């Protein structure tokens, strides 16, 4: 009879990596930076030749009805569009008395943070030892360890 090999994941729960609070925070910051850099998009018209031809529109709108005529203001808004970093730098250079994007913030919460399960969203009394994510039941813990623990979707 052929012996079955045990699954690598279920060999020994003591072999799972345990991260301290600082390592968890570094991991979360690295994941957030990767998300910030992930969706960066350049101008889709940048590589196309401009020989007086009309450039294609890369809009996802599927309007088959009447088309709205673009006004001159819309033309300049589309042509001289700025990215988020350029808008922040412009706002920092202009002196304004009121709160801006960098100075506006909410005060600390008056109540403690409510812990919710990372898998199903219900209130969770337990925390994963390895990564610090919350879970509510053994079933959610199993799902978390199989699919999410120490991966990009904590």
From Swiss-Prot:
A motif (Nuclear localization signal) lies at residues 38-47. Keywords: Chromatin regulator, Coiled coil, Metal-binding, Nucleus, Phosphoprotein, Zinc, Zinc-finger. It is found in: Nucleus. It comes from the Eukaryota. Residues 23-39 form a coiled coil. Residues 1-73 are annotated as: Disordered. Higher expression in testis than in other tissues (at protein level). Expressed in the lens (at protein level). In the intestinal epithelium, expression is enriched at the bottom of crypts. In hematopoietic cells, enriched in hematopoietic stem cells and progenitors with significantly reduced expression in differentiated cells such as granulocytes, monocytes, T cells and B cells. Belongs to the ZNHIT1 family. This is Zinc finger HIT domain-containing protein 1. The lineage of its organism: Eukaryota, Metazoa, Chordata, Craniata, Vertebrata. The gene is Znhit1.
């Amino acid at each position: 009879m052929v012996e079955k090999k045990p699954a690598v994941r279920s060999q020994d729960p003591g072999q799972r990596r345990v991260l301290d609070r600082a390592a968890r925070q570094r991991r979360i910051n690295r994941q957030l930076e990767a998300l910030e850099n992930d969706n960066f998009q350049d101008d889709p018209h940048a590589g196309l030749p401009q020989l007086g031809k009309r450039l294609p529109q890369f809009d996802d709108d599927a309007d088959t009805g009447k088309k709205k005529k673009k006004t001159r203001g819309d033309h300049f808004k589309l042509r001289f569009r700025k990215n988020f970093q350029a808008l922040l730098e412009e706002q920092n250079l202009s002196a304004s008395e009121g709160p801006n994007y960098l100075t506006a913030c909410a005060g600390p919460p008056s109540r403690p943070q409510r812990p919710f399960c990372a898998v199903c969203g219900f209130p969770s009394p337990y925390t994963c030892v390895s990564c610090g994510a919350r879970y509510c039941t053994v079933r959610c813990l199993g799902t978390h360890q199989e699919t999410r623990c120490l991966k990009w979707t904590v």
